[in-house]
Amino acid sequence: MLYLLSDLSSSFTPLNVFRYITFRTGGALFTAGLFVFWFGPWIISLLRIRQGKGQPIREDGPQTHLLTKRGTPTMGGLMILAGAVVAILLWANPRNHYVWVTLTVTLGFGAIGFYDDYLKVTKQSHKGFSGKFRLALEAVIAMAACVTIAVYSPAALQNQLAFPVFKDALLNLGWFYPLFGAFVIVGAGNSVNMTDGLDGLAIVPVMIACGTFGFIAYLVGNSFTASYLQVNYVRDTGELAVVCGAVIGAGLGFLWFNAPPAQIFMGDTGSLALGGLLGSIAVATKHEIVLAIVGGLFVLEMMSVIIQVASFKLTGKRVFRMAPIHHHFEQKGWKEPQVVIRFWIIAVILAMAGLATLKLR
């Protein structure tokens, strides 16, 4: 909303600062972080009282988890979403359609995750509601978002899939594009969901990916930088940098409480929402393939589950000691902090590789 103050800059010049995306991105980051840090203890106390036993812990997982994680409340994504939404509404341009599409996906996926968490906590079971029904709901939200994005995208880029590295390489997917875009968004949401299994494991790679895509959105949404880098210019997507800034700020605030030993878990409420957000930004900026690089850690986690399930059904044997793959390394003897920090390092390397594609033309 503060962006609207820039309309008064002709009367009071200092208000012109609210036009700058970089200034508002910093403001969103600071606001979201302060919000989560300030209200975090109250939210954690409330969730602990409401949930009692907290998130159910897998009996077949590392035995240390039964001792160190039992009783920890979940639904910490509420903290992240609350801080991010407040900051976005305060600092982002309310006239920007990409902001509203991204918010819709984020809150829609967050609501699905919240209900799933609610069922798990109340039933003290790892099974939420039907996986197929959950995927169907996510697909409907994602499809609606992709159709809206396509409507507002430049005519030359509608229904086009852009390839990194290759200059002007576009593939017209036609009416199949919304399906592809929905696959990206739903896949991103569930991949981040699979990654969220250890203290701090998911939130830092999410912040790294958000920082990367915030930078990409800023460059793609600026005609000068897009022309210089020879990437597709998508007008108005620069505003998504403010959204990414808000998520990073909220993520930093959440990490304060999620650092080991975690006082709260993100839960499906946060992981589905944040993954959906990343997917929708990738679709809006026409960098869907780059998301697979930047978010390669999330892809690895999801693929480990798919491979494990497929292998067991086809051969009766498991490829990994346990899936997702972060538990495989725990079963091999890695300590939880080792797994988490090494996966963070991988996330940084993949983010740098994703950014490198902007320059390779």
Curated annotation (Swiss-Prot):
Subcellular location: Cell inner membrane
Organism: Methylobacterium radiotolerans (strain ATCC 27329 / DSM 1819 / JCM 2831 / NBRC 15690 / NCIMB 10815 / 0-1)
Enzyme nomenclature, EC number: 2.7.8.13
The protein's required cofactors: Mg(2+)
NCBIfam families from the UniProt entry: mraY (TIGR00445)
Enzyme class (EC, first level): transferase
Assigned keywords, A-Z: Cell cycle, Cell division, Cell inner membrane, Cell membrane, Cell shape, Cell wall biogenesis/degradation, Magnesium, Membrane, Metal-binding, Peptidoglycan synthesis, Transferase, Transmembrane, Transmembrane helix
GO molecular function: metal ion binding; phospho-N-acetylmuramoyl-pentapeptide-transferase activity; UDP-N-acetylmuramoyl-L-alanyl-D-glutamyl-meso-2,6-diaminopimelyl-D-alanyl-D-alanine:undecaprenyl-phosphate transferase activity
Name of the protein described by the UniProt record: Phospho-N-acetylmuramoyl-pentapeptide-transferase
Pathway: Cell wall biogenesis; peptidoglycan biosynthesis
GO cellular component, one term: plasma membrane
Keyword Transmembrane appears in the UniProt entry: yes
Residue intervals passing through the bilayer: 27-47, 72-92, 99-119, 135-155, 169-189, 200-220, 240-260, 264-284, 289-309, 338-358
Topology term for the membrane: Multi-pass membrane protein
One Pfam entry name: Glycos_transf_4
CDD domains linked: GT_MraY (cd06852)
Family: Belongs to the glycosyltransferase 4 family. MraY subfamily.
Function summary: Catalyzes the initial step of the lipid cycle reactions in the biosynthesis of the cell wall peptidoglycan: transfers peptidoglycan precursor phospho-MurNAc-pentapeptide from UDP-MurNAc-pentapeptide onto the lipid carrier undecaprenyl phosphate, yielding undecaprenyl-pyrophosphoryl-MurNAc-pentapeptide, known as lipid I.
Keyword Cell membrane: yes
Stored HAMAP family: MraY (MF_00038)
Reaction(s) this enzyme catalyzes, per UniProt: UDP-N-acetyl-alpha-D-muramoyl-L-alanyl-gamma-D-glutamyl-meso-2,6-diaminopimeloyl-D-alanyl-D-alanine + di-trans,octa-cis-undecaprenyl phosphate = di-trans,octa-cis-undecaprenyl diphospho-N-acetyl-alpha-D-muramoyl-L-alanyl-D-glutamyl-meso-2,6-diaminopimeloyl-D-alanyl-D-alanine + UMP
Listed PANTHER family: PHOSPHO-N-ACETYLMURAMOYL-PENTAPEPTIDE-TRANSFERASE, PHOSPHO-N-ACETYLMURAMOYL-PENTAPEPTIDE-TRANSFERASE HOMOLOG
